[in-house]
């Protein structure tokens, strides 16, 4: 076992605070509308430029192991805030630094660390309740656009795109962010259900100008099996031909004789058919086939439940107003499934989302909900260079998370004003003893830190602005972008309540643990090893007399 280096008391806390300050000072330059960028050196490729707090925090590793422990604990604050709300990482880091700095001063002055922590926790619990009372619902497009704009570092185009996307696919819809091909940002909305499977044969194409298959009011056959024998298909094909409608076959696979016969029938104009593979694999494929069945009012033909393809009738088929199939995707528009059945299926999947343990499963389930509920929006980010594209994409991603958080828990006045108002309301809060009262004061003083840092990044005097804002009430605050005072909500400067709440809770949680630290243990750095000196191989000393 490696030897350990142990530090106690003030020695440990000073080292830890130094690490906290290095990380927080690097992160907090990005805060606010006039925050600066940070350039990150990468081991390969061009350097990355970012204004995202958590991206900066993740890059920091310090040489001194004790200082690094302090930095890593604050990195945890940024990561947790990012996981919970998708934004507010810089605010969380600034709050953590403020609580730790003030808290360690109190410890050095002889206060009891455990009582300080209890005081901080009490203040944060009360602050969260106050934030809830200050919160106003965020339901209209204008408010959503404002939240998106603030979170994307005052980029109005991004805010408007996100609001437009939410209008089109609903608040619960799936919105994804992708690299664009031009200089402008674009919004692409896929209505209906789309999945990543294209036609099985190019001979099905009936729109040569677009290279796509378009079927109007088709029957949709859903089969959870491979189809290779055409005899299984004959009753279905005959029934569809009599009905005079096209047919879409979605199956595990269609191959050999069955595929060849379908192609020949299509080319001769006997029946208009197209075949695609079912989306997904294994259990997920079964579930997605069931989703399509619910959307189109059909039944999945599966031998597991005793259904055979030869006995399938038109009643077992799904139907839709239109189907478009190209090389890579299939889109089903306006399925005829009953609304109640679709909502029931959506409710079922939402229950699975709540119980899902992995992010991947959750993401896939959310995609299924969106496909059933109305569509998917894709924001294509445009930029002149790859470096700018990466930076912008990270901002759009942050803005998207922030708007979702705003829809979920509402919004409060931005620019650090909400925390200032909360601190003012809690000025009479008291603990069980004097040390707890100091802990409460530490937390309330720290709540001014985000506003002070935003002002500092503008090049103004933080104390002057903080005192002016404190003298006002309600949503009165300082607009750092225009350097004016006024009503923050009216000026469109909003923060999602969830983002502010998460930042405060995670900052206080980690800061409380660090204030109560009395001892730090780490491995002793390994030396360079014994100096073997010049000379040949070991054991050859004394061989010089061989001449």
UniProtKB/Swiss-Prot annotation:
Record's catalysed reaction(s): ATP + H2O + a folded polypeptide = ADP + phosphate + an unfolded polypeptide
E.C. no: 5.6.1.7
Protein's cellular compartments: Cytoplasm
GO cellular component terms given for this protein: cytoplasm
Keyword vocabulary terms for this entry: ATP-binding, Chaperone, Cytoplasm, Isomerase, Nucleotide-binding
Domain of life of the organism encoding this protein: Bacteria
GO molecular function, one term: ATP binding
Record bears the keyword Transcription: no
Enzyme class name: isomerase
Pfam families: Cpn60_TCP1
Primary subcellular site in the record, as a coarse category: cytoplasm
Presence of the UniProt keyword Metal-binding in the record: no
Gene Ontology BP term (one): protein refolding
Residues engaged in binding ATP: 30-33, 51, 87-91, 415, 479-481, 495
HAMAP family, alphabetized: CH60
Function description: Together with its co-chaperonin GroES, plays an essential role in assisting protein folding. The GroEL-GroES system forms a nano-cage that allows encapsulation of the non-native substrate proteins and provides a physical environment optimized to promote and accelerate protein folding.
Family: Belongs to the chaperonin (HSP60) family.
Protein's UniProt name: Chaperonin GroEL
Organism, as annotated: Enterobacter sp. (strain 638)
Gene name, Swiss-Prot/TrEMBL: groEL
């Amino acid at each position: 076992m490696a030897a350990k280096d142990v530090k106690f008391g003030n020695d440990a806390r000073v080292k830890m605070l130094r690490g906290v300050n290095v990380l927080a000072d690097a992160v907090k330059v990005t805060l606010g509308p006039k925050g600066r960028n940070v350039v990150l050196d990468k081991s390969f490729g061009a350097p990355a430029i970012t204004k995202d707090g958590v991206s900066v925090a993740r890059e920091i590793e310090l040489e001194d192991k004790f200082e690094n422990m302090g930095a890593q604990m604050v990195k945890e604050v940024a990561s947790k805030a990012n996981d919970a709300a998708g934004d507010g990482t810089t605010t969380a880091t600034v709050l953590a630094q403020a609580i730790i700095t003030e808290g360690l001063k109190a410890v050095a002055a002889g206060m009891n660390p455990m009582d300080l922590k209890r005081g901080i926790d009490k203040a944060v619990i009360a602050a969260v309740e106050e934030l809830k009372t200050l919160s106003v619902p965020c339901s209209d497009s204008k408010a959503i656009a404002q939240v998106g704009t603030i979170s994307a570092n005052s980029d109005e185009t991004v805010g408007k795109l996100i609001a437009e996307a939410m209008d089109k696919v609903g608040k619960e819809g799936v919105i994804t962010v992708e690299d664009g091909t031009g200089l402008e940002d674009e919004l692409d909305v896929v209505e209906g259900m789309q999945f990543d499977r294209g036609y099985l044969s190019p001979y099905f194409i009936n729109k040569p100008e677009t290279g796509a298959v378009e079927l109007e009011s088709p029957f949709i056959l859903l089969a959870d099996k491979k189809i290779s024998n055409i005899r299984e298909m004959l009753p279905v094909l005959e029934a569809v031909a009599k009905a005079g409608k096209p047919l879409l076959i979605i199956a595990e696979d269609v191959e050999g004789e069955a595929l060849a016969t379908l192609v020949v029938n299509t080319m001769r104009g006997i029946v208009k058919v197209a075949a695609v593979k079912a989306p997904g694999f294994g259990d997920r494929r079964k579930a997605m086939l069931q989703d399509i069945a619910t959307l189109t009012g059909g039944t999945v033909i599966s031998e597991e439940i005793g259904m055979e393809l030869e006995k399938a009738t038109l009643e077992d088929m799904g139907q839709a107003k239109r189907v478009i199939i190209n090389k890579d995707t299939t889109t089903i528009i306006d399925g005829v499934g009953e609304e109640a059945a679709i909502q029931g299926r959506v409710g079922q999947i939402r229950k699975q989302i709540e119980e899902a343990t992995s992010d991947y499963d959750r993401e896939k389930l959310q995609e299924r909900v969106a496909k059933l509920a109305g569509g998917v929006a894709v924001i294509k980010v445009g930029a002149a260079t790859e470096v700018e594209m990466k930076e912008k994409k990270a901002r759009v991603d942050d803005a998207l998370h922030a708007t979702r958080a705003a829809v979920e828990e509402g919004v409060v006045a931005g620019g650090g004003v909400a925390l200032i108002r909360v601190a003012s309301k809690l000025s009479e809060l008291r603990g069980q003893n004097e040390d707890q009262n100091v802990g409460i004061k530490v937390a309330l003083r720290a709540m001014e830190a985000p506003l002070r840092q935003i002002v500092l990044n503008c090049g103004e005097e933080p104390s002057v602005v903080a005192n002016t804002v404190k003298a006002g009430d309600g949503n009165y605050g300082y607009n750092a972008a225009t350097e004016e005072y006024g009503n923050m909500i009216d000026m469109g400067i909003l923060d999602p309540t969830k983002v502010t709440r998460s930042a405060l809770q995670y900052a206080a949680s980690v800061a409380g643990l660090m204030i109560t630290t009395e001892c730090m243990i780490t491995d002793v750095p390994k030396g360079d090893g014994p100096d073997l000196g010049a000379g040949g191989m070991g054991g050859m000393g004394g061989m010089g007399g061989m001449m």
